[in-house]
């Protein structure tokens, strides 16, 4: 584990720990050359647990995937530093809160806000789907969308994203978040493609506009105007077409 005040690659000073998962620690760091703060994810390269090894390799693959992307709604990865026992991934430090935090604390969001977020999310999905090969995100949900202080969003956590391969017909065994994930993401009976992300987007918008978490009872999706008759019929149709 990196020490507070230490330097990584003689460039990034570790300021404080800002997050920790099972296989990684995230620090806030200062780039002394650019006078800019970055988030630095520390990954252990080796583990005695085979399952943990898979998680680590997935995180490394995620970093290499994001590093190739360039979109204002995606975090940038600016450096990947490999040392004897650890790998450091240097990326944008994103200020703000997740949309999950926002809806949990404020309830259903206004129609204007949700439409604005929907436009931003569809733009980033279009960007991903038009890469060569296309990138299928597979985990759109409020907790994976950061709302910045300026009102713009960032899509985070590419842990289960993949490059689309038409011949890969069985790629979907239990990947995704129940309530948001498309049916083909469970059971290994179908292939995920751009339509998978559209389904997840629809469920995300449903949660934001109704305040009803699809992961909680009644586990049934009603038209959004069932919950709020003043909402737009057009928005209701869009969400229903997504899912």
What positions do the PLM features span?
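Conserved short submotifs of the Hanks-type protein kinase catalytic core
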Residues: 84-98
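AlphaC helix of the eukaryotic protein kinase fold
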Residues: 47-68
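Activation-segment/catalytic-loop signature of the eukaryotic protein kinase fold
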Residues: 80
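C-terminal lobe helix-coil module of Hanks-type protein kinase domains
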Residues: 179-243
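Protein kinase glycine-rich loop
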Residues: 15-21, 26
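Activation segment signature within eukaryotic-like protein kinase domains
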Residues: 117-118
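Protein kinase catalytic-loop region centered on the HRD/HxD motif
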Residues: 122-135
């Amino acid at each position: 584990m990196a020490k507070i005040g230490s330097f990584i690659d003689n460039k990034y000073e570790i300021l404080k720990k800002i997050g920790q998962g099972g296989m990684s620690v995230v620090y806030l760091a200062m780039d002394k050359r650019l006078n800019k703060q970055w988030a630095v994810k520390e990954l252990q390269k080796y583990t005695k647990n085979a399952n943990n090894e898979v998680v680590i390799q997935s995180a490394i693959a995620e970093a290499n995937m994001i590093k190739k992307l360039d979109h204002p709604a995606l975090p940038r990865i600016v450096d990947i530093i490999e040392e004897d026992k650890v790998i450091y991934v240097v990326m944008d430090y994103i200020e703000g809160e997740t949309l999950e935090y926002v809806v949990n604390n404020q309830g259903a969001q206004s129609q204007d806000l949700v439409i604005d977020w929907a436009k931003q999310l569809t733009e980033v999905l279009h960007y991903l789907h038009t890469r060569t090969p296309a990138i299928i995100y597979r985990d759109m949900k409020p907790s994976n969308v950061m709302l910045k202080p300026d009102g713009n969003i960032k899509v985070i956590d590419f842990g289960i994203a993949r490059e689309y391969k038409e011949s890969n017909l069985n790629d979907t065994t239990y990947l995704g978040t129940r309530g948001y994930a498309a049916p083909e993401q469970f059971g290994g009976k179908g292939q995920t493609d751009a339509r998978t992300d559209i389904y997840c987007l629809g469920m995300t918008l449903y949660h934001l506009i109704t305040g009803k978490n699809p992961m909680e009872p009644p586990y049934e999706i009603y038209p959004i105007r069932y919950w709020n008759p003043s909402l737009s019929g057009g928005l209701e149709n869009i969400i229903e077409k997504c899912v």
